[in-house]
């Protein structure tokens, strides 16, 4: 275990950043591939099947958002414990995060069993689409414990600087999902239900592999999964992990509201465009999120060790990389949006509508990189509330924007422009807070040197 824990307070920052970020980015792409694999096969069934899964996926996204409590909680509490030289504390936080994530998954599963139908009714779908969406949602509930525990284990490995293990395990899960999707959906004729079952089986395999790997690696000399929860540590985990979790939930609620507007303005083609377009767009923001998670770990260790100059340098190097990704995303989405969308949905009406979506949201990609990278900095500092507040306010601005732009007669484009403009505003706001933090820390260092 000792060689698995990397000291990120020493050595070349670029090397640390890319060594940790690349496997995390790979893991993010695996998650994208999970979703796009389902979309590709379901797109071959019908656009209605795609709309059904897209609507159900929003609520699965809400559930998965709560897994961030322990994923981010693990990354920050454990990395800061390692950076400060408190290994026993880091070990205890590992146990607390895993046990807490299991309890959260069971609670969320119970809530969804009771209210799944009511939640899906928020989309006002036609009966046939609603029925398929409900089937997909119910079957997906089986995978909740796997999702939550996997998120916690991933956070633990990221915190110690070993992002390769989650990547390798995720690859095996993806391979399983890609093999099972066509078998369950077409060969066995299970359709939408087959897509859900393929994903659940893959998630279960990933969890089993994590359990085996953690035991084999003897992380922190071996730590128990089921423990008595200690309020002091749980409170710290909640302080760090809770702000990003409601952020994703509230973001999903906005998506539900906007989804209703899209359904009204564009029917099931509009819903399929938004949900599929979001999966395509995730190619850029998931890449940036991989860098952000690596940045969180590096910042966590160096901040706890009092090395603020390395914190600042790590942020600048991460941002230079994500901005390149953002500019490339803009070029691809604006100029080749139709061709990209047609790879997933072969229906002409759908991929032409998708090209309009990608062309508009593509304009905001670089600004989205600013927001996401700054999140990684503030997460590592333990100040998760700041990016959460910026994102919540910026995301909720989409609602009045949609109403305003729609009143101008923009049709469904009103929704796409609201998404793009709000992303630009959030990126600029996070840049402002970063500059303010840098100025304040420089002043503090200057005062300390004078003293």
How does the language model describe each region?
Residues 33-36, 44-47, 81-84, 159-160, ...:
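Helix-loop interface residues and adjacent transmembrane-helix termini in multi-pass membrane transporters
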């Amino acid at each position: 275990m000792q060689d698995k824990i990397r000291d990120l307070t020493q050595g070349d920052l670029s090397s640390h950043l890319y060594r940790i970020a690349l496997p995390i980015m790979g893991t993010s792409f695996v998650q994208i591939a999970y979703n796009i694999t389902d979309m590709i096969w379901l797109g071959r069934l019908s656009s209605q099947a795609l709309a059904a899964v897209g609507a159900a996926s929003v609520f699965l996204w809400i559930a998965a958002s709560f897994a961030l409590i322990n994923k981010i909680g693990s990354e920050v509490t454990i990395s800061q414990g390692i950076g400060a030289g408190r290994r026993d504390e880091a070990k205890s936080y590992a146990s607390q995060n895993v046990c807490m994530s299991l309890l959260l998954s069971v609670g969320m599963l119970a809530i969804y069993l009771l209210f799944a139908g009511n939640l899906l009714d928020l989309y006002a779908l036609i009966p046939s689409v609603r029925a398929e969406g409900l089937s997909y949602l119910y079957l997906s509930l089986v995978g909740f414990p796997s999702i939550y525990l996997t998120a916690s284990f991933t956070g633990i490995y990221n915190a110690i600087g070993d992002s390769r293990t989650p990547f390798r395990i995720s690859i095996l899960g993806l391979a399983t999902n890609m093999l099972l999707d066509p078998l369950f959906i077409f060969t066995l004729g299970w359709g939408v239900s087959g897509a859900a079952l393929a994903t659940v089986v893959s998630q279960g395999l990933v969890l089993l592999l994590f359990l085996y790997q953690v035991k084999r690696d003897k992380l922190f000399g071996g730590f128990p999964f089921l423990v008595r929860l200690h309020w002091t540590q749980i409170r710290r985990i909640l302080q760090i992990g809770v702000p990003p979790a409601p952020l994703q939930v509230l973001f999903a609620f906005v998506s539900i509201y906007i989804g209703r507007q899209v359904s009204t303005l564009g029917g099931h083609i509009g819903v399929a465009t938004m949900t599929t377009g979001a999966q395509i767009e995730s190619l850029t923001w998931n890449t940036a999120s991989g860098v952000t998670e690596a940045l969180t770990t590096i910042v966590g260790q160096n901040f706890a060790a009092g090395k603020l100059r390395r914190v600042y340098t790590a942020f600048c190097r991460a941002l230079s990389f994500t901005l390149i990704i953002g500019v490339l995303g803009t070029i691809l989405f604006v100029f080749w949006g139709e061709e990209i969308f047609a790879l997933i949905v072969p229906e002409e009406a759908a991929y032409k509508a998708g090209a309009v979506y990608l062309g508009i949201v593509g304009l905001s990609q670089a600004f989205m990189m600013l927001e996401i990278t700054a999140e990684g900095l503030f997460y590592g500092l333990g100040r998760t509330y700041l990016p959460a507040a910026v994102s919540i306010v910026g995301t909720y601005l989409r609602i009045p924007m949609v109403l305003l732009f729609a009143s101008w007669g923009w049709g469904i484009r009103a929704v796409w422009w609201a998404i793009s403009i709000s992303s630009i505003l959030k990126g600029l706001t996070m840049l402002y807070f970063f500059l303010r933090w840098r100025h304040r820390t420089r002043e503090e260092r200057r005062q300390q040197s004078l003293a």
